[in-house]
């Protein structure tokens, strides 16, 4: 990657690997090509990592992943001296083991810090010099100046505030920000089709059902956070395996699909339970269970909605 990449050509090439996200792709490209660091704010499973990986591959630069949590100390982020060698040789540059921040700076890569606001304050403060000066000094190891293509890309989940840290103005003032929300239904159907060979043996009708029930988790009143599109993908994959075991050859024409007692709807309920019950997060004030919520959503799709559509 050069310091002034052709962002139009990059956008066109990267877009061929994505379903939707053209607008977000343009904004991310514009920010990183302008030399800016960036925080992406959105729930898991919205394509943030896919976008960054595609851009990094297109530009031929490495992508370093770090998970933000209470265990991410400054030493784990920046690096540390090898204790065994220190005992023999004392502290020196030779026995310093660089962490992902220094590796990204030295190699001109993207440092992707997930769950940015879960990292401790002292760890986040170590980023200030890298963000402001593109240079960091490590005691007894010297200074590292970032290669021009180095960028910090952070991510945050706005739907989950448990165990998070309020970011200081000194950090947020040095970052651009982009909200990345769930995609629309058509885009999610396209993603699931792509990842499941158009629904496999059960066909595209299963894909539509899976996407519908999965999206319904995001608006259920008892849930603090619903499932990403990964839930719909897993519904389809699990349902196809169940169908093979149970001898359900296809998903159905309109008659059997609307009959909640037929094999296909029951199969979808079982697949939903496996795929969604661990992905959805109950509201703290809720007195229900994940399995009950899944069953309610299934009933909305296969019992209540078809009944409402019946004439008379």
Annotate the PLM regions:
Residues 1-208, 311-312:
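AAA+ P-loop NTPase catalytic core and its hallmark functional loops
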Residues 127, 131-134, 214, 218, ...:
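Short flexible/disordered coil segments
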Residues 249-312:
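C-terminal engagement/docking regions of AAA+ P-loop ATPases
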Residues 174, 187-191, 216, 234-238, ...:
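A general alpha-helix detector
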Residues 84, 239-242, 274-279:
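Phosphate/oxyanion-binding loops and surfaces in catalytic or ligand/nucleic-acid-binding neighborhoods
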Residues 47-48, 206, 227-231, 264, ...:
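Short, conserved alpha-helical segments within structured domains
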Residues 130, 209-213, 271:
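Short acidic/histidine-centered micro-motifs embedded in hydrophobic/aromatic stretches
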Residues 199-257:
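Conserved AAA+ ATPase small/helical "lid" subdomain
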């Amino acid at each position: 990657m050069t310091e002034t990449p052709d962002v139009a050509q990059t956008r066109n090439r990267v877009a061929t690997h994505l379903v939707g996200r053209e607008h977000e792709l343009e904004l991310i490209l514009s920010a990183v090509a302008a030399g800016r660091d960036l925080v992406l704010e959105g729930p898991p499973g919205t394509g943030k990592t896919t976008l960054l990986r595609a851009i990094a591959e297109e530009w031929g630069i490495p992508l370093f992943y770090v998970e933000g949590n209470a265990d991410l100390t400054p030493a784990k982020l920046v690096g540390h001296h090898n204790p065994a060698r220190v005992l023999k040789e004392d502290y020196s540059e030779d026995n310093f083991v660089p962490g992902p921040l220094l590796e990204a700076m030295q190699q001109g890569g993207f440092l992707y810090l997930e769950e940015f606001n879960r990292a401790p304050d002292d760890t986040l403060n170590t980023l200030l010099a890298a963000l402001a000066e593109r240079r960091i000094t490590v005691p007894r190891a010297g200074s590292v100046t970032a290669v021009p293509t180095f960028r910090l890309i952070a991510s945050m989940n706005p739907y989950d505030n448990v165990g998070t840290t309020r970011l200081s103005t000194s950090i947020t003032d040095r970052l651009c920000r982009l909200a990345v929300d769930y995609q629309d239904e058509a885009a999610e159907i396209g993603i699931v089709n792509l990842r499941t060979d158009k629904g496999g043996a059960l066909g595209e009708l299963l894909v539509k059902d899976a996407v519908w029930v999965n999206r319904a988790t995001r608006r259920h009143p008892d849930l603090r956070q619903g499932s990403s599109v990964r839930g719909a993908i897993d519904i389809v994959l699990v349902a196809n395996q169940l169908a093979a075991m149970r001898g359900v050859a296809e998903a159905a024409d309109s008659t059997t699909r609307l009959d909640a007692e037929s094999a296909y709807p029951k199969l979808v309920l079982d697949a939903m339970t496996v795929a969604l019950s661990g992905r959805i997060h109950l509201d703290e004030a809720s007195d229900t269970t994940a399995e009950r919520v899944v069953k309610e959503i299934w009933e909305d799709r296969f019992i209540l909605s078809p009944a409402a559509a019946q004439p008379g």
